[in-house]
Amino acid sequence: MSESTKIRDIAQALGVSIGTVDRALHDRRGVNPLTKSRVLQMAKTMGYQPNPAARFLSSKRRVRISVNLPAQIASFWDTVREGIDEEARTFAAFGIDVELHTFPRMGFGEQEAFDAALESKVNGIIIATGRPQDLRGSILKASRARIPVVSVVTDAPGTARLAVVSIDSPASGALAGELLSRLLQGQGKVAVVTGDLAITDHAEKYNSFRASVNAFSPSVQVMEPIQNHEDETEAYETCRTLLRAHPDLNGLYISTANSAPVLQALADVGRLNDHLTVITTDLFPALIPHIESGAVVATLYQRPKSQGQLALRMLNEFLVGGRCPSHQLRLAPHVIMKSNLSFFLDRISMESEMEESNAFAATPKLRKESS
């Protein structure tokens, strides 16, 4: 039967009122059992599918969603926020208020932001957490209060979160490991610059990178990871310390978006474009010249905008439509090199133009605040 069957179609087929059909379908009082049975059977015969979004609109109920994301690294997290902003426009009519809150960086201030969201009695929360074990109790409290929590970018394993949307971190690390192994032809010393191994995403990338290098090139030495805690100054200083201690370094994998200060450190000590194979993460304007010059042989694009869009879409569908999402949605990373850089630049530019053209199509209740 037609998927567009409406309540009025069932009412016409049975010769009863629309109100009677509505009460029968939604198990409300005022319908005798025989009529209710006839309505349910006709709905099944005609292939009726309930429209939870329409029911939500008719209820005139509003939903508040708190989005808690770090301020640093801005080039990455601002793009995640762009995706959330764009997705919010697509369901502006549903009466959903999206509140954006920021905390300094991963692992710093996220507990306070989460607790503030709970106290304000929001209906759903999107988080990026660097200390999932510290938030376990708060996420459980949210779950018991029927406030769904969706993790974005990095997971919060072992918690009561509803779902996670992230890049496939093990795949990213494994790709970087295979690329470096092949480019170094099975010899040399490589280092990994990351944020914090307490963060699920960072730990998964490092572990899979090391396993991949060991599988493809057992003779390549993988050094202990350099953690900079997503701080630009620390990233610069720790990289310079690394290069002073290991002037014979052959390869470098920067596993987070915090690559600008690392590349600056390489340039300042004369190692950029100097027999050092560098693989980075993500794509932003300052990185483009380094890819074009060959100083960066490849970058692994984490699709931050898509992650933001999908996280909000998943939470919205659960709150409005009652659809339980997959517990884990992992996106495939994109490998960007000099030869295909223009394709991704054109694509990102096109997406930005489309977003600007649609900016006035709808005006969602989206508030930006800092915690």
Stretches with model-predicted labels:
Residues I125, T129-S143, F209, Q227-A286:
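Hydrophobic alpha-helical
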Residues T90-F94, A145, V213-V220, A245, ...:
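Short helix-capping segments at alpha-helix termini
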Residues M1-F56, L366-E369:
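N-terminal helix-turn-helix DNA-binding module of bacterial transcription factors
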Residues P50-E112:
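Amphipathic helical "hinge" segments at domain boundaries
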Residues A176-S217, E224, L315, R323, ...:
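An alpha-beta-alpha
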